[in-house]
């Protein structure tokens, strides 16, 4: 049965988006997983914990015996059915456990006995993780051009349109501001870094890449932070600043934060609950910057937000949101970004409008 041994093999797995049947326990998978992995555990969290305690107290033979006792009969059959279905659905996939140890070998042997030969990652998730970390360190050494600009400048869409662009916010599932959350929960830090490494590897492999195009991000994107090796290189990068007219920016923000988010919430939760989730999302974003706005200004803008939501609910129009969005941009977001940009003015190599429409920076 074929097994993968070298780092080049591991990189090839990530570049090809090879389906990975990850047989670790759910708690391990949630802490960090590869982008194309599905979690079909040999043992659930409780079973894994019990086997771990047994191993410490009685040794490996007793732990192995307990594992076979816990995963037997109907439980084993149910898991075999799931693995078999996954193998048939992903004939070019691969098995993976923590370190390429007993769990993936046991599942591989059981599948072999059932007539399915399926390869495994010899070094397990740990080897793939180390490959991802090393790849990011190496690829981050290439020159970087950052796309900067005030909120609503279309930076993210501009990055997405570049063949050498990597959408950091898309990978983080967060748009990087107080209002940046999406309906997708953010991944663990390790999973985010693995996603980033895989995306950089794929982008680099599919073209003669000489430099990266990234959005000018802070260290944190929601709850995820950029790998230090990449963040350090970004501090040295040149910057192209998009300076679109204020009205164009407002159109983008209206589309992204009001029209699209309202649509996404109602699509996910239904009209009534979706509306409540949408209202809470906007209020939570404004509340997150209450201290910086000051209590009096926050209360004024929150009242305008409530009025805008009432208008939107009764008429469908989002125009009322301009009453709080415009001062929020003019008094908070724009001055903050311009202050940050002034500190790295010597790195700016371009300023000007971008003709793109839609999207959100």
From Swiss-Prot:
Q: Which residues form the active site?
A: 97 (s-selanylcysteine intermediate)
**So which domain of life are we looking at?**
Bacteria
Per the UniProt record, which EC number(s) apply here?
2.9.1.3
**Residue ranges of the Rhodanese domain?**
14-137
Could you confirm whether the keyword Transferase appears in this record?
A: yes
Quote the SMART domains the UniProt record gives: RHOD (SM00450)
Q: Which Gene3D superfamilies match?
A: Rhodanese-like domain (3.40.250.10)
Instruction: Relate the protein's function as given in its record.
Output: Involved in the post-transcriptional modification of the uridine at the wobble position (U34) of tRNA(Lys), tRNA(Glu) and tRNA(Gln). Catalyzes the conversion of 2-thiouridine (S2U-RNA) to 2-selenouridine (Se2U-RNA). Acts in a two-step process involving geranylation of 2-thiouridine (S2U) to S-geranyl-2-thiouridine (geS2U) and subsequent selenation of the latter derivative to 2-selenouridine (Se2U) in the tRNA chain.
Give the family per the record. Belongs to the SelU family.
Identification of the protein by name: tRNA 2-selenouridine synthase
Q: Which organism is it from?
A: Escherichia coli O6:H1 (strain CFT073 / ATCC 700928 / UPEC)
Origin organism lineage: Bacteria, Pseudomonadati, Pseudomonadota, Gammaproteobacteria, Enterobacterales
Q: Which gene encodes it?
A: selU
């Amino acid at each position: 049965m074929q097994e993968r041994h070298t780092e080049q093999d591991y990189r090839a797995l990530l570049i090809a988006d090879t389906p990975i049947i990850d047989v670790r326990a759910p708690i391990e998978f949630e802490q960090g997983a590869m982008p194309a992995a599905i979690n079909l555990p040999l043992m659930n969290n409780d079973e894994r914990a019990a086997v771990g305690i047994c191993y410490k107290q009685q040794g490996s033979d007793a732990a192995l015996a307990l594992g076979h006792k816990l995963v037997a009969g109907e439980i084993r059959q149910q898991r075999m059915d799931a693995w078999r279905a996954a193998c048939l659905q992903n004939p070019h996939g691969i098995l993976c456990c923590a370190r390429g140890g007993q769990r993936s070998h046991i599942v591989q042997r059981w599948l072999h006995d059932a007539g399915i030969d399926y390869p495994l990652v010899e070094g397990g998730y740990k080897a793939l993780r180390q490959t991802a970390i090393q790849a990011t360190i190496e690829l981050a050494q290439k020159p970087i051009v950052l796309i900067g600009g005030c909120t609503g400048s279309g930076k993210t869409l501009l990055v997405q349109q570049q063949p050498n662009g990597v959408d950091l916010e898309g990978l983080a599932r967060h748009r990087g501001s107080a209002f940046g959350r999406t309906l997708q929960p953010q991944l663990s830090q390790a999973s985010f870094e693995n996603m980033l490494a895989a995306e950089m590897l794929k982008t680099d492999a599919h073209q003669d890449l000489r430099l990266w195009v990234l959005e000018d991000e802070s260290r944190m994107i929601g709850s995820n932070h950029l790998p230090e090796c990449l963040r350090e290189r970004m501090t040295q990068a040149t910057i192209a600043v998009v300076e679109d007219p204020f009205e164009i920016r407002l159109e983008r923000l209206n589309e992204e934060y009001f029209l699209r988010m309202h649509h996404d919430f109602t699509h996910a939760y239904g009209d009534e609950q979706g509306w409540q989730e949408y209202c809470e999302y906007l209020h939570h974003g404004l509340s997150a910057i209450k201290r910086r706005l000051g209590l009096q200004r926050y209360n004024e803008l929150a009242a305008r937000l409530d009025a805008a939501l009432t208008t939107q609910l009764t008429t469908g129009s989002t125009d009322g949101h301009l009453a709080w969005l415009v001062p929020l941009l003019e008094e908070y977001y724009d001055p903050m970004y311009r202050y940050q940009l002034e500190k790295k003015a010597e790195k700016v190599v371009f300023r000007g409008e971008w003709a793109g429409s839609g999207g959100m920076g």
